[in-house]
C-alpha cells in the first residue's frame, strides 16, 4: 500500500476523472504541457521497446548483485547522481500485506533493484536509499512510530543531499475491493515532477498495460517524504496487492522486470526535457 494511502486512510480505487475524499486532483494540463508531453511520448515509444529488451537481460542477472552492500547504499564515487531509487517501507514497516501474505516492502525492493540495475546499464548514476528489507531509522528510535518518523526523515535528508537528482519511490497499492488493478503514478509539488510522472504513466499504458486509463496525479501534502525534498519526485504505485491476478504478477520476477523497465523508460525518455 502506498504511503499516502496509509496516512489518509484512503486507497486509490478510482480511475480517470474520479476524485478522492481527502484531496482534489489538479486540472488538466495546459496546451504547452500537452505539447511537451507529446514530444516525450514520441521518444519513449522507441525507448520503451529498447529498455524492455534490456530489462529482460538484466532480469536474468539481478540475483547476482552483491548481497553485502550496506542498507543505505553510498553514492557512486566521482559521479553525479541523477536518480534516487526509493524502495518504500522496510523492516518492521512492511507496508501492505496481500491476501496471500505477501509483504509490500519486499516487492518494492525487488522492483527498485531492477530499476537501479537498468539505470546502471544505461550509464545513469543512481542511488538506492535502501538495498535490504530493513528500516533506515536511527538507533535511538524505539517505538514503531518513532522508527517510521526517523526512517522518513533520513530518506528525505539523503535525497536532499542530491537536489539535482530525481527521486523515484516504489510502492504497491491496496483496496477493500479486489477488482481494482493497474499502475498509478503520483508526483511531488516540485518543478518537473508532474512531467516526469506523466512520462512514466504514459509508457506504462503504451508498453505494458494498454487497458490502464489512469492519469498521473498530485501527491497529497500528508506524504512526508514527497513533500520534504527539493528534488523532482514521483511515487509509483505499481499495482494492487488486493487484486488476486495482480498479486500473482507482482511476485513474478519477470513481471517485476517489465515494471522496472517501463518505469526506467519513462524516466529516461522524459529526462532531457525535464532538466
Predicted regions and their residues:
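Catalytic-site microenvironment of enzymes
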Residues: 2-275
Amino acid at each position: 500500500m502506498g504511503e499516502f494511502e496509509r496516512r489518509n486512510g484512503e486507497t486509490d480505487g478510482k480511475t480517470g476523472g474520479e476524485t478522492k475524499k481527502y484531496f482534489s486532483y489538479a486540472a488538466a494540463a495546459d496546451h504547452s504541457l500537452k505539447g511537451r508531453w507529446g514530444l516525450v511520448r514520441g521518444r519513449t515509444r522507441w525507448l520503451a521497446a529498447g529498455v524492455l529488451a534490456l530489462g529482460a537481460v538484466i532480469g536474468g542477472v539481478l540475483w547476482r548483485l552483491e548481497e553485502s552492500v550496506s542498507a543505505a547504499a553510498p553514492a557512486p564515487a566521482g559521479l553525479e547522481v541523477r536518480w534516487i531509487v526509493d524502495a518504500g517501507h522496510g523492516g518492521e514497516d512492511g507496508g501492505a500485506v496481500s491476501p496471500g501474505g505477501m509483504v509490500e516492502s519486499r516487492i518494492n525492493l525487488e522492483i527498485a533493484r531492477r530499476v537501479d540495475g537498468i539505470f546502471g546499464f544505461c550509464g545513469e548514476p543512481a542511488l538506492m536509499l535502501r538495498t535490504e528489507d530493513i528500516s533506515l531509522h536511527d538507533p535511538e528510535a524505539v517505538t514503531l512510530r518513532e522508527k517510521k518518523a526517523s526512517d522518513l526523515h533520513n530518506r528525505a535528508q539523503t535525497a536532499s543531499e542530491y537536489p539535482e537528482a530525481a527521486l523515484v519511490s516504489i510502492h504497491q497499492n491496496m483496496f477493500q475491493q479486489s477488482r481494482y488493478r493497474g499502475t498509478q503514478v503520483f508526483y511531488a509539488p516540485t518543478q518537473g515532477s508532474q512531467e516526469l510522472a506523466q512520462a512514466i504513466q504514459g509508457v506504462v499504458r503504451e508498453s505494458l498495460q494498454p487497458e490502464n486509463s489512469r492519469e498521473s496525479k498530485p501527491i497529497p501534502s500528508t506524504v512526508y517524504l514527497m513533500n520534504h525534498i527539493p528534488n523532482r519526485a514521483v511515487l509509483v504505485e505499481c499495482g494492487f496487492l488486493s487484486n488476486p491476478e495482480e498479486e500473482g504478477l507482482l511476485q513474478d520476477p519477470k513481471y517485476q522486470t517489465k515494471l522496472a523497465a517501463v518505469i526506467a523508460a519513462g524516466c529516461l525518455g522524459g529526462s532531457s526535457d525535464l532538466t
